[in-house]
């Protein structure tokens, strides 16, 4: 009788271990598909990711590059001061989206163009995502929006 209980206990522990392993693998796979890494334009230019990889790119919308087509397709360049990457987006852009403004886009590279499926703009005049601030600081082009310039005006990300 004792041998039977011990055998049954080992079977239950083995089944629980297998179930836990399967659950861990399933959760890990689901999380991996939901994680989108952030890259700056300089990082994308230095080491272009595979076309199948979905990631976020962030920086400033380069002045003079914003082109709104007749359809809902918009093209622009995202820069961090070190490199510029062409972006194409089909859809309605956020109200605060514009040239010299911070943006983060989700999508993938196709033939040297970042095809965005989602475009985010900062939600007020002073906010900029941490990743974008870090990338701009690394390139030496970040200006604190709360700091005043030599003329007494506020610098902002665009320097105006």
UniProtKB/Swiss-Prot annotation:
<feature type="transmembrane region" description="Helical; Signal-anchor for type II membrane protein">
    <location>
        <begin position="10"/>
        <end position="30"/>
    </location>
</feature>
<comment type="function">
    <text>Heme chaperone required for the biogenesis of c-type cytochromes. Transiently binds heme delivered by CcmC and transfers the heme to apo-cytochromes in a process facilitated by CcmF and CcmH.</text>
</comment>
<keyword id="KW-0479">Metal-binding</keyword>
<feature type="binding site" description="axial binding residue">
    <location>
        <position position="127"/>
    </location>
    <ligand>
        <name>heme</name>
    </ligand>
</feature>
<keyword id="KW-0472">Membrane</keyword>
<feature type="topological domain" description="Cytoplasmic">
    <location>
        <begin position="1"/>
        <end position="9"/>
    </location>
</feature>
<comment type="similarity">
    <text>Belongs to the CcmE/CycJ family.</text>
</comment>
<dbReference type="InterPro" id="IPR036127">
    <property type="entry name" value="CcmE-like_sf"/>
</dbReference>
<dbReference type="GO" id="GO:0005886">
    <property type="term" value="C:plasma membrane"/>
</dbReference>
<keyword id="KW-0408">Iron</keyword>
<keyword id="KW-0735">Signal-anchor</keyword>
<dbReference type="InterPro" id="IPR012340">
    <property type="entry name" value="NA-bd_OB-fold"/>
</dbReference>
<feature type="region of interest" description="Disordered">
    <location>
        <begin position="141"/>
        <end position="160"/>
    </location>
</feature>
<keyword id="KW-1003">Cell membrane</keyword>
<keyword id="KW-0201">Cytochrome c-type biogenesis</keyword>
<dbReference type="GO" id="GO:0046872">
    <property type="term" value="F:metal ion binding"/>
</dbReference>
<feature type="binding site" description="covalent">
    <location>
        <position position="123"/>
    </location>
    <ligand>
        <name>heme</name>
    </ligand>
</feature>
<keyword id="KW-1133">Transmembrane helix</keyword>
<feature type="topological domain" description="Periplasmic">
    <location>
        <begin position="31"/>
        <end position="160"/>
    </location>
</feature>
<keyword id="KW-0812">Transmembrane</keyword>
<dbReference type="GO" id="GO:0017004">
    <property type="term" value="P:cytochrome complex assembly"/>
</dbReference>
<dbReference type="GO" id="GO:0020037">
    <property type="term" value="F:heme binding"/>
</dbReference>
<keyword id="KW-0349">Heme</keyword>
<protein>
    <recommendedName>
        <fullName>Cytochrome c-type biogenesis protein CcmE</fullName>
    </recommendedName>
</protein>
<keyword id="KW-0997">Cell inner membrane</keyword>
<dbReference type="Pfam" id="PF03100">
    <property type="entry name" value="CcmE"/>
</dbReference>
<dbReference type="InterPro" id="IPR004329">
    <property type="entry name" value="CcmE"/>
</dbReference>
